[in-house]
A protein has these predicted regions:
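Acidic helix N-cap motif at the loop->helix transition within catalytic regions
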Residues: 24, 46-55, 103
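Catalytic-site signature of metal-activated, phosphate-bearing donor transferases
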Residues: 1-2, 9, 74-82, 88-94, ...
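"A position-specific structural signal for the A-helix of alpha-solenoid helical repeats
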Residues: 203, 240, 275-278, 321, ...
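A conserved acidic beta->alpha catalytic loop
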Residues: 29, 39-52, 69-70
């Protein structure tokens, strides 16, 4: 099933387990852009398999449903990948709780690269994830958890310009109340075998944070930062050290030092600096907050960064914080100018827009 790069064939590739409550939304979002599907079920006890069969029968899309016992994420994803490798020009990787948002009559076109990132949105965080891979390259999943695609031949991975994926934690894995504790044990064991694996170390820190253990998360994030490697991940680890300190109510100077260390490590990113300004405002340090952030209110979203971009920080949140600080230190005209600009934006949450309009009235 091969076509030209202008009109490539696409095969949906997934692993699923007990996704009956969510799977239809995902399938509906991709049905018009795929030519084939290969899905591996890893042990569903609900009617996930029947829903998949019925859906693709109704829409007359050929494909295959397989069953494989569960071992770990990379093992099971690799089984599904190998079964799909000869079915199309490209594989589209999706999770059951993903939803592809795209223009009407959308099809992937002009595909020539070895793989493509697709922008993903999880709450207010934007990141890019490799979702499309060319099947004539030896792709393989790596990692027992938080798995990723790797290839031992040269390839390029641009961001596909159209469409984006709304990610969530509504799938079966996300419903497990002990998910983060389970992940911690898996990652600790994996790090015993691969102590220099920076990805495992990063997600160990993430798992401690998500489980609410900020003290241990802070330690693990610092370990990850000290390991070096991918600059975006080092930056985010340093940022989270500061955020964990804030959650633990460490002294203000200590928190500020950690956040500024993160910012100066990667100054094209604003998340850490924005959080520092927030901490200044909350501590009544309005002059300090103003001077830290005033020269960064027009900083654009970095074009080539892909890890956990808080796009709202760049779009409006930094300006909002600086406007508040400006109003407190007597710079009313500047505060009014910023609040006016913010009040005219269309993408603000309603409660924030109401607050900003109220602030504008008293400038």
């Amino acid at each position: 099933m091969k076509k030209t790069p202008e009109n490539p064939t696409i095969c949906l590739n997934m692993i699923v387990k007990n996704e009956s409550h969510i799977i239809l939304r995902c399938l509906e979002s991709v049905k018009d852009m795929i030519d084939y599907w290969v899905i591996s079920d890893t042990g569903s006890t609900d009617n996930t398999q029947q829903i998949i069969r019925d859906f693709f029968t109704e829409h007359q899309i050929p494909g295959e449903l397989h069953e494989h016992p569960w071992k770990d994420f990379s093992h099971n994803r690799n089984l599904a990948l190998e079964l799909a490798r000869d079915k199309a020009d490209y594989l589209l990787m999706m999770d059951a709780d993903d939803q592809f948002i795209h223009p009407p009559n959308f099809r992937f076109s002009n595909l020539t690269e070895g793989s493509y990132y697709i922008n993903c949105v999880l709450k207010n965080i934007t990141y890019a994830r490799r979702h499309l891979i060319r099947t004539d390259l030896p792709w393989k999943w790596e990692g027992v958890i938080h798995e990723y695609l790797e290839c031992n031949q040269p390839y390029t991975t641009p961001i596909y310009p159209d469409g984006y994926i709304i990610a969530s934690t509504e799938g079966a894995r996300g419903q497990n109340p002990d998910r983060f504790k389970d992940d911690i044990e898996v990652l600790k064991a994996a790090l015993q075998d691969e102590p220099d694996n920076t990805r495992y170390q990063f997600y160990l820190a993430q798992s401690y944070r998500d489980d609410g253990n900020y003290e241990q998360a802070m330690i693990e994030y610092q370990k990850r930062a000290d390991m070096g490697g991918w600059e975006e991940e080092v930056y985010y680890s340093l940022f989270e050290v500061g955020r964990c300190q804030a959650r633990l109510e460490k002294p203000f100077p200590q928190i500020l030092e950690a956040l500024l260390k993160a910012h100066y490590y990667r100054p094209i990113r604003l998340e850490a600096l924005h959080y520092a300004v927030v901490m200044c405002r909350m501590s009544g340090q309005y002059h300090l907050g103003y001077h830290l952030g005033i020269h960064h209110i027009e900083t654009p979203v970095p074009e080539n960064d892909v890890l956990f971009l808080a796009s709202d920080v760049y779009q409006w949140k930094m300006k909002d914080e600086i406007a508040v600080c400006a109003s407190w230190i007597g710079r009313k005209p500047q505060a009014k100018e910023l609040f006016t600009e913010l009040s005219q934006m269309d993408n603000l949450p309603e409660e924030d827009k109401t607050r900003i309009i109220d602030n504008l009235k008293i400038c």
